[in-house]
Amino acid sequence: MDDGSTDETVKICESFPQVTEIHSQKDLPFDETRDKNKLLEIALKRDPDFIITLDGDEVVMPNSKQRIFYELNVLYPNVSLFEMKEIYVWDEPNRYRCDGIFNNTWSKKLFRLKNQPEDLQFARTKFPGNAHCAAFPDNLIGGTQSVRSKVKILHYGYYDEELRKKKYNFLNKLDPNNTEFDGYRHIFSEESKFSGPNGMEFRLISEIEE
C-alpha cells in the first residue's frame, strides 16, 4: 500500500517480481484499521494458506524460512495464530534495545487461513485514527490460542534519532496527552514507565539465541 509516499518506495517495490499489486491512496486521514482491511482484501484475492502482517519498517530475521515452515507444518499444524518477538534495531545494524518493554514485545503477526470465516476483518480501536490496531483479524478462529514462534522480527522504525523523533511527533499529534502509552516517551527516553529500571540497555543482534 502506497499512502502518498514521496521517496522511492513505489519504484523499489515495482522492481520486485513477487510484488503482485500496489494499492495507491493519497490525502486520506490516518486510519490503521481501514488500511489493514484493504490490504487483507487484496491478500485474500491470492487465495493464500497463510498471511503475515509486517509493517513497512519490519523484516523477518534472515534465515528464518525453514523454521517458519517447520513450525507451521510439523510442530503446530493446527494452530491458527503465531506470535513473533520484536527486535528493535537501534542506531547500529547489529545493535538492539533490550530494556523494559523492548525486551518483551511479542506481536501476533502470522495467521493460518484454513477453516476461517470469509468475512475476516480487523477491528476498530479506541485510539484516534484506529491506531494500535491488532496485526490479526478480530474474528479469526483460534485467535485466543496463539503460539510463540522462535522466528523474530527486526523492527527498524526507531533505528536512529531522526526516525524516533518523527515517530514520537506523529503519535503525539495523532493521540495527544495519551496516558496509557505514557505519552510515547519510551520511543526516545529512558525515563518512561515502559523503559527499564537501569535506563537504556543494548545487546548485539548477532548474539541472539536461535
Residue map of PLM features:
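Short amphipathic alpha-helical segments
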Residues: 11-14, 64-66
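CheY-like receiver
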Residues: 23-27, 37
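Short beta-strand-to-loop acidic/aromatic patch adjacent to the donor-nucleotide binding site
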Residues: 47-61
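A conserved acidic beta->alpha catalytic loop
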Residues: 2-12, 26-29
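Catalytic-site signature of metal-activated, phosphate-bearing donor transferases
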Residues: 33-37, 62-210
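Active-site nucleotide-sugar/metal-binding loop of Leloir-type enzymes
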Residues: 37-50
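Short His-Asn-centered micro-motif
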Residues: 1-3, 54-55, 82-85
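Short, conserved SAM-binding/catalytic segment
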Residues: 15-19
